[in-house]
């Protein structure tokens, strides 16, 4: 009986460790960042327009598309910053006071895609993530929300947005990453933060 319990414990611990091992397989950011850097003039312009760090934009481009403006995912995320017309694209259109959603050709246009990606980051920062005080924690929250939705992230802290933001403000960046690794339902959420740091280090 003790042997069975010990075997069960080993399996349980192995499962827990694999859940948090978001750095495997290792990701080499060098080439994706080099390709993303070619769009830096556009990223700087969009960043200035929307109050977003151009290096954050460049890192997201490296992670999302590897700098390929024609990239299309299985879920129909399009372009350099992998925007979905029916979700983030529609949100940006609404912020601009426009109806409808962007076309595929519009999302494959580097300038339009980066501009809308920066606008969407601004929507996240000034909307559901407003009130996060630590700049690095905010950066982490932005990329996790960009990839998997702000609502999903906030609900790992509380169903009440204000309470969630308050709990986030009790954490430093490492503690926030640990919380995401332990509590976020999407395994790619902590890995996105890992890739973000790899990309920023490669610039």
UniProtKB/Swiss-Prot annotation:
Topology in the lipid bilayer: Lipid-anchor
Catalyses which reaction(s): Endolytic cleavage of the (1->4)-beta-glycosidic linkage between N-acetylmuramic acid (MurNAc) and N-acetylglucosamine (GlcNAc) residues in peptidoglycan with concomitant formation of a 1,6-anhydrobond in the MurNAc residue
S-diacylglycerol cysteine lipid sites: 16
Gene3D superfamilies: 1.10.530.10
Highest taxon, organism lineage: Bacteria
Location in or out of the cell: Cell outer membrane
Record's keyword annotation contains Lipoprotein: yes
A Pfam family recorded for this sequence: SLT
One annotated GO biological process: peptidoglycan metabolic process
One term of GO molecular function: lytic endotransglycosylase activity
EC number, UniProt record: 4.2.2.n2
GO cellular component: cell outer membrane
Covalent lipid adducts (N-palmitoyl cysteine), residues: 16
Keyword annotations of the record: Cell outer membrane, Cell wall biogenesis/degradation, Lipoprotein, Lyase, Membrane, Palmitate, Signal
Record's signal peptide: 1-15
Catalytic EC class: lyase
NCBIfam families reported in the protein's UniProt record: PRK15470.1 (NF012014)
Function as written in the Swiss-Prot or TrEMBL entry: Murein-degrading enzyme. May play a role in recycling of muropeptides during cell elongation and/or cell division. Preferentially cleaves at a distance of more than two disaccharide units from the ends of the glycan chain.
Protein family per UniProt: Belongs to the transglycosylase Slt family.
Protein name per the record: Endo-type membrane-bound lytic murein transglycosylase A
Organism of this sequence: Shigella dysenteriae serotype 1 (strain Sd197)
Origin organism lineage: Bacteria, Pseudomonadati, Pseudomonadota, Gammaproteobacteria, Enterobacterales
Gene that this sequence comes from: emtA
